[in-house]
């Protein structure tokens, strides 16, 4: 009788621990993906007008919305770039990069993922929503007659681009600062933010995997590194060796293998290696001001300097797509 009681107590304790870990996984996923991402009213976001771009609005399936950007006074190439944005208020945070490509004659299709800025949706739902957006953008582009389709993505967008390339045939992929998978991303984010200690994160990781499986099925835990290998698509992986958001060790840059992959390590760069070192420094200063709610200083912040392009990195991207 005592043994039976002991077994019941042990089982009850184990069940309680499992339920607690699952609850932490669900709640942390909700914090990351359970709300919409809109523009911060205290920040400046560059628009098409700032760069004299034409912006044709488009609506895709399930309320996904975006624009096809181009430069009217420049001959248009037959190659289309689909830009996949990172976490935040959608592609409007990348207008400087979009304008850069347009200045070289590329039309650029940029679509906000579910729950971001222009697109519908009460929340982001999860990481795989970005992949679904990239796939929808590819299908839309093909319906419009574009045959030479190239994906360029940053951070979450890089993950989306790599995973989408395993689902749809595209010409080339450029993945900048790409994370590997949802569970690894959640784990690293929790540690970097100081929310959870690494030993606890290691225990919770399987539960993040479970949450994403329930959300999206087998696709929910897609590995960008495995997708990059599977697709066989010529791919340029770019990563900064100082990246603390997606560390080099836990990146697709480090894990992905294949002769069709080209890798460029941006030395001295953090999470936005397409920007100059000064721009990244300025962004770090801005981030600290946001944390301290120093909004008066933010209104006088030099946003142009904080989005300055690194010509070497951007040219590598252009040369890769055109090559």
Name each region found by the language model.
Residues 3-60, 64-71, 287-296:
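An N-terminal hydrophobic leader/cap segment in hydrolases
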Residues 87-100, 113, 249:
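The serine-hydrolase catalytic nucleophile loop
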Residues 98-120:
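Conserved alpha/beta-hydrolase
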Residues 231, 237-239, 243:
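Short beta-strand/loop motif that positions the catalytic acidic residue
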Residues 244-250, 274:
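Conserved alpha/beta-hydrolase "acid-adjacent" motif
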Residues 278-323:
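Catalytic active-site module of serine/aspartate enzymes centered on a nucleophile-bearing elbow/loop
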């Amino acid at each position: 009788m005592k043994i039976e009681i002991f077994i019941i107590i042990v089982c009850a304790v184990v069940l309680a621990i499992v339920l607690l870990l699952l609850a932490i996984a669900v709640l942390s996923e909700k914090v990351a993906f359970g709300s919409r991402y809109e523009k911060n009213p205290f920040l400046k976001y560059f628009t098409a007008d700032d760069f004299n771009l034409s912006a044709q609005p488009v609506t895709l399936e399930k309320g996904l919305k975006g624009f096809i950007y181009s430069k009217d006074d420049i001959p248009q190439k037959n190659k289309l770039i689909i830009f996949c944005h990172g976490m935040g208020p959608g592609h409007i945070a990348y207008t400087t990069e979009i304008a850069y490509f347009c200045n070289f004659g590329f039309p650029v299709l940029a679509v906000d993922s579910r729950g971001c800025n222009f697109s519908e949706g009460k929340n982001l739902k999860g990481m795989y929503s970005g992949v679904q957006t990239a796939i929808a953008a590819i299908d839309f582009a093909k319906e419009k007659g574009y045959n030479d389709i190239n994906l360029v993505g940053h951070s979450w967008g890089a993950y989306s681009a790599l995973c989408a390339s395993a689902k749809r045939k595209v010409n080339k992929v450029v993945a900048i600062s790409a994370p590997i998978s949802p569970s690894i991303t959640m784990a690293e984010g929790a540690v970097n933010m100081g929310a959870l200690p690494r030993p606890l994160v290691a225990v919770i990781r399987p539960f993040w995997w479970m949450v994403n499986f329930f959300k999206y099925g087998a696709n929910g835990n897609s590995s960008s590194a495995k997708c990059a290998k599977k697709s066989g698509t010529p791919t340029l992986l770019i990563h900064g060796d100082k990246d603390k958001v997606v560390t080099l060790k836990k990146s697709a840059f480090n894990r992905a293998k294949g002769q069709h992959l080209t890798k460029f390590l941006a030395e001295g760069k953090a999470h936005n290696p397409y920007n100059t070192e000064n721009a990244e420094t300025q962004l770090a200063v801005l981030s600290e001001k946001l944390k301290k709610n120093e909004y008066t200083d933010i209104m006088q912040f030099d946003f142009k300097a904080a989005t300055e392009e690194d010509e070497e990195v951007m040219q590598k991207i252009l040369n890769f797509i055109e090559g």
